[in-house]
Design a protein with these regions (language model features):
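Short, low-complexity, charge-dense intrinsically disordered segments
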Residues: 1-15, 24-25
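Alpha-helical transmembrane segments and immediately membrane-proximal extracytoplasmic
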Residues: 14, 19, 23-455
Length: 455
């Protein structure tokens, strides 16, 4: 029996020729067909030893990892949202004067949770960790973040679930990366992918959520972590599908805006003009938050005392202006469906800005993106009431885009998010308004970590 030993090293044409000559001398009876089979076997062995050459597709193991992070994020977001909806339904029974003691006690309970389980931080800390700690978000703070944010949001705080979910899902991406011994930029990309998955689950916009997770990292540059864009997009898409399947929340605009007429060339200029009002509201919001933060920092008391005081203040505002309660996910539709006087809208605007400021500076957990959209919509209604006969959908969406871009420094993702959330599919006027708010924003951003200064 003839035995032929197959080498696993790569075979070049020169080596092929030498092997053929040696085989011809040693085995004169070896036919050309046997040599071809031998060369084919060596070629197949080499392809198996180099899987990247064997795989004809673009996707790799990292692609599957991005999908897995998105699926895990979708499951976490679904669980969080389901529990939050149940708590909102139960605590919404407290109306009138009962809101004040409810939110005061809620602040105390959430503060005690943070005091004993540890401070999970806020969006500022998340951005700081992504930028200066290699993208590592600590999962050990998740229990405190989940429990305290459930209480704060469900009782009526003017902050949404986006910030808690970003921390929880983003840190889950970090945990997965550590378990798989992934380091460097790949670890940071997985954390950002988790953040994008959380944003997308709440906003229902995979592209907008991915861009927001990147833009929020810097006050000027969207592309600082451009290598994380593809992981963020993949995780967002897989997470969004899982979230929709588990919650049955539906696909479509979150807020039903009036039908927008056929766009005209002047609409771009009007969008920038209306955006000035939204930008002014953004300045007012930033100044109010900074003043409130300064006041609470002067209180040398434990976190649960600050949060109790914050709950008392927010509850008092909610008692006098009930529409300012909660994070405005459903309340914005009330603005669109009912008619209000100019006086009431001005009162609501001031009350909501104060409520958000007291919420985020007293230690209450939650994000201010959706509440900011509510403030922008209110500003749009104020402009329309003061100058009737204008294009109401364009006014509202322009003010919403401008104030969010002014405060969060995210003009591109804000444009995509609003087009998805409102069903306002005329993209360019929103972009003009977002850029107006971005370039007229204060030089120092509200989120200090966006400046690139390590804290």
């Amino acid at each position: 029996v003839l035995s032929v030993k197959i080498s696993v090293s790569p075979v070049t044409p020169l080596v092929d020729q030498k092997l053929h000559q040696e085989d011809s001398k040693q085995f004169p009876y070896l036919c050309p067909m046997d040599f071809k089979r031998r060369r084919l076997a060596v070629t197949l062995r080499n392809q198996l030893n180099y899987p990247l050459q064997f795989n004809p597709f673009v996707f790799s193991k990292l692609f599957l990892l991005w999908v897995a992070v998105g699926i895990v994020g979708g499951v976490i977001a679904s669980f969080y949202w389901t529990v939050l909806e149940s708590l909102l339904h139960y605590l919404s029974q407290f109306q009138g004067f009962a809101v004040i003691p409810l939110m005061t006690v809620a602040g105390l309970l959430a503060g005690l949770i943070i005091h004993f389980l540890g401070d999970p931080g806020e969006m500022d800390l998340i951005v700081n960790n992504i930028r200066f700690k290699g993208g590592r978000l600590e999962p050990k703070n998740n229990p405190a973040m989940i429990l305290s944010s459930w209480i704060c949001i469900a009782s009526g705080g003017s902050a949404g679930p986006e910030a808690p979910l970003v921390q929880v899902v983003g840190s889950t991406g970090t945990w997965i990366a550590r378990k798989l011994r992934i380091k460097g930029e790949d670890l940071r990309s997985l954390s950002i992918a988790g953040m994008a998955s959380a944003f997308t689950a709440l906003f229902g916009a995979p592209l907008g959520g991915s861009l927001f997770a990147l833009e929020i990292q810097h006050h000027k540059h969207i592309s600082e972590y451009y290598q994380a864009l593809m992981p963020a997009l993949v995780a967002s898409c897989s997470g969004y599908v899982v979230f929709i399947l588990l919650t049955h929340i539906g696909i479509g605009p979150t807020w039903v805006f009036p039908i927008y007429s056929t766009p005209e060339l002047n609409d771009f200029f009007y969008a920038m003009l209306y955006a000035l009002a939204g930008t002014a509201a953004g300045w007012l919001f930033i100044l109010t938050v900074r003043q409130s933060r300064s006041l609470f920092k002067k209180l040398r008391v434990p976190i649960y005392v600050k949060m109790t005081i914050g709950g008392l203040l927010i509850g008092t505002i909610a008692y006098f202006v009930p529409l300012s309660r909660y994070f405005s996910h459903d309340e914005l539709n009330v603005l669109l469906e009912q008619q209000f006087t100019l006086k009431f809208l001005l009162i609501l605007l001031g009350a909501k800005i104060l409520a958000i400021a007291f919420t985020v500076t007293s230690g209450w957990r939650g994000g201010f993106i959706i509440p900011l959209f509510f403030v922008g919509a209110t500003v749009g209604l104020v402009v329309n009431a003061a100058f009737p006969g204008q294009n109401l959908p364009l006014i509202m969406v322009s003010c919403m885009a401008a104030i969010n871009a002014c405060v969060t420094r995210t003009p591109i993702s804000t444009t995509v998010l609003l087009a998805t959330l409102t069903g306002f599919h005329h993209f360019i006027p929103i972009l003009f308004a977002s850029l107006t708010g971005f370039f007229l924003a204060p030089k120092t951003p509200l989120i200090n970590a966006q400046l690139g200064i390590k804290e």
